[in-house]
């Protein structure tokens, strides 16, 4: 058997190989969801995605002879490091055959690259940051992921541990469906709190796109600013994100919450379009998928993509009010049988307990790993 070599991605052909590799790796896996290829290329390309205005990266391929056996991205997120006053390197976009030698060579190359950039530790998988798809699936392999959540083979956690990484944080998702019966006390309390605080709900207005993006950016920082691993996305990143998902957004499930005309929370629930991504195998962008009306009956669920409440409203029941509105809005859409919420940090006990007491059940668990470089 030929040995493993790791090479940097330098040409368009190399980039195509890097992007295409998961299609080979997962070709017999019924739960893998192909991403939209054009969006993957955009996300990975400096000059085409706003993330790279403040960050840098190197892409690598692992070869065994002439066969591609794995890939990885080594990243320095300059915005995060400035915001958190840390020297963090990142690994992401990792895919590999069940080949410990190849995985070890990829991680060694990523570690060496971020060390040369002056980083003190490396964290991952982040694709390319916590504001995007993050975490390695460690529990919940028996079903497909929802839209914009990661997926990987069950052997990945062992490959990561063999390269000297330790668990740093777990991310949790929760599931509700039409058979879920939230306790009556929770629903009644949510209604009473909404009335007492005079909570108002306003749907996002696409006619005022720039204003809505600015408000979403502001609330994202105010709602999540104290979270572990957080760095605020730039307005350009938020605008790019909204532009990318807008074709499939259900505007009945995208709203801001107000108390006395002060915005206090935001919720965006997206149709789980993974059946269509699977059907069209990454060849169609989201704008093209929306035109495939014949197949939209295959979409029977949704994902709580964004659900946040400002800190000063959390102790007066606002998270329960937001959850109440979300679940009721989804329930009023007969095409949606289930809604997945998350991810949540494992130690966000208040929100995780709220979900469980409201009848939601734990669904999937994702893990962020760390290795110190000193």
Locate the predicted segments by residue.
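Generic start-of-chain signal for non-secretory N-termini
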Residues: 1-31, 37, 374
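Acyltransferase donor/substrate-recognition loop-hinge adjacent to the catalytic core
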Residues: 2-4, 150-229
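Alpha-helical subdomain
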Residues: 76-79, 278, 307, 353-359, ...
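Acyl-donor binding region in acyl/amide transferases
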Residues: 82-164, 280-357
């Amino acid at each position: 058997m030929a040995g493993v070599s790791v090479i940097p991605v330098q040409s368009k052909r190399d980039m195509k190989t890097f992007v295409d590799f998961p299609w080979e790796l997962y070709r017999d896996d019924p739960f893998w969801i192909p991403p939209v290829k054009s969006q993957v290329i955009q996300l990975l390309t400096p000059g085409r995605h706003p993330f790279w205005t403040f960050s840098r990266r190197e892409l690598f391929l692992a070869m065994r002879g002439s066969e591609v056996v794995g890939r990885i991205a080594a990243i320095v997120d300059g915005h995060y490091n400035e915001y958190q006053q840390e020297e963090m390197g990142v690994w992401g976009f990792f895919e590999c055959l069940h080949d410990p030698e190849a995985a070890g060579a990829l991680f060694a190359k990523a570690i060496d690259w971020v060390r040369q950039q002056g980083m003190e530790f490396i964290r991952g998988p982040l694709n390319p940051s916590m504001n995007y798809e993050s975490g390695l699936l460690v529990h919940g392999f028996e079903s497909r992921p929802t839209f914009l959540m990661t997926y990987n083979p069950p052997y990945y956690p062992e490959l990561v541990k063999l390269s000297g990484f330790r668990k740093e944080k777990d991310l949790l998702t929760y599931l509700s469906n039409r058979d879920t019966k939230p306790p009556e006390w929770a629903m009644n309390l949510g209604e009473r709190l909404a009335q007492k605080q005079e909570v108002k709900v306003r749907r996002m207005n696409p006619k005022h796109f720039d204003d809505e993006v600015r408000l979403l950016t502001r609330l994202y920082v105010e709602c999540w600013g104290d979270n572990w691993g957080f760095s605020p996305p730039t307005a350009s990143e938020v605008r790019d994100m909204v532009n990318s998902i807008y074709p499939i957004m259900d505007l009945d499930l995208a709203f801001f919450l107000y108390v006395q005309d002060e915005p206090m929370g935001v919720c965006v629930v997206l149709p789980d379009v993974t059946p269509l991504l699977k059907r069209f195998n990454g060849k169609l962008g989201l704008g093209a998928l929306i035109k495939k009306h014949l197949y939209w009956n295959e979409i029977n669920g949704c994902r709580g993509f964004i659900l946040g409440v400002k800190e000063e409203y959390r102790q007066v029941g606002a998270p329960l009010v937001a959850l109440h509105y979300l679940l009721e809005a989804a329930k009023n859409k007969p095409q949606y049988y289930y809604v997945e919420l998350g991810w949540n940090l494992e130690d966000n006990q208040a929100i995780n307990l709220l979900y469980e007491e409201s009848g939601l059940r734990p669904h999937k668990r994702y893990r962020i790993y760390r290795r110190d470089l000193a």
